[in-house]
Amino acid sequence: MKTGGAVQPVMDQAIFAHILFNELEGRFNGTNSEFRWEGQGWVGTDYDKLWIKSEGTLSKGAVDDGQQQFLYSRAVTTYFDLQGGLRSDIDSRPTRNWAAFGIQGLAPYFFDLELTGYVSGEGHLAAKLEASYDLLLTQRLILQPQVELNVYSKGDPARLVGAGFSDIDTGLRLRYEINRKFAPYIGVVYEGKFGQTANFARRAGDSAGDVRFVFGVRTWF
């Protein structure tokens, strides 16, 4: 039986927006310090979204490891989206552009997971794995292990990147949520380089592996 009144909008077609900075932090060891950012934002519906992702490191007055991604995503399951678009490596070294294809979502046991493959205009291949997990110690105190791993099919000496497993960035952060949208944190991270990438770093006068203490904030809106 039909009822009177206006037709209600379908909520899964409503347009929303979200911005998250998971890392806004200073990284410190005994010899030098650096500033690291990692954030992403999207606008769209429950099924279709446009994404911007940005990450990089400011060290010694120069930007390193700068990556900007512009993606479209489509929900394919309750927990995962397929993504495709462009990645640009923009920092103090020569710019590189890639086509990007991957998945993002919640893996079993609610691990945040991003797995993305890349193809450059020269036919080079790359892949990135990012994973993290929020362990609630209390309603406000949260421990987050995190890992990022990069792989390249061919070396790029101009960007100090070698073929094979290139680098890892992994850490453990303890944050306190003053409110749901703002949480300062402390932690420790390990930045490691492998193989040719480690050799490039040493020749440039950098370390192939560093343990650093971090202080930062996580925020979203």
Language-model-detected regions and their locations in the chain:
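Outer-membrane beta-barrel initiation region
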Residues: M1-A62, G66, F70-R74, F213
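Residues that define the transmembrane beta-barrel architecture of outer-membrane proteins
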Residues: I15-A17, S33-W37, D64-Q68, T95-A99, ...
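Transmembrane beta-barrel strands of outer-membrane/channel proteins
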Residues: E23-G26, I52-G56, G84-S88, L115-V119, ...
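Membrane-embedded beta-strands of outer-membrane beta-barrel proteins
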Residues: G39, F70, F101, L129-A131, ...
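Residue-level signature of outer-membrane beta-barrel architecture
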Residues: V43-T45, R74, G105, V119, ...
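Repeated loop/turn-to-beta-strand initiation elements of outer-membrane beta-barrel proteins
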Residues: Y47-I52, T78-L82, Y109-L113, T138-L143, ...
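Detector for outer-membrane/organellar transmembrane beta-barrel domains
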Residues: T95-P157
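Outer-membrane beta-barrel "beta-signal"
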Residues: L172-E177, A208-F221
